[in-house]
């Protein structure tokens, strides 16, 4: 069970970082406008 939780935590953190990077880029463009 602990090994499956670690595997699920790795893909979940990568998806969260990719979404945050895209949201931060959109916020910077809106603030410049």
Curated annotation (Swiss-Prot):
GO terms for molecular function: DNA binding. Keywords: Chromosome, Developmental protein, Differentiation, DNA condensation, DNA-binding, Nucleosome core, Nucleus, Spermatogenesis. GO terms for cellular component: nucleosome; nucleus. It is found in: Nucleus; Chromosome. Residues 1-33 are annotated as: Disordered. The keyword Hydrolase does not apply. Testis. One of its GO terms (biological process) is cell differentiation. Signal peptide: none annotated. Protamines substitute for histones in the chromatin of sperm during the haploid phase of spermatogenesis. They compact sperm DNA into a highly condensed, stable and inactive complex. This is Protamine TP16. It comes from Oncorhynchus mykiss (Rainbow trout).
């Amino acid at each position: 069970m602990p090994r499956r939780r670690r595997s699920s935590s790795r893909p979940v953190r990568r998806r969260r970082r990719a979404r945050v990077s895209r949201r931060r880029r959109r916020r910077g463009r809106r603030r410049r406008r």
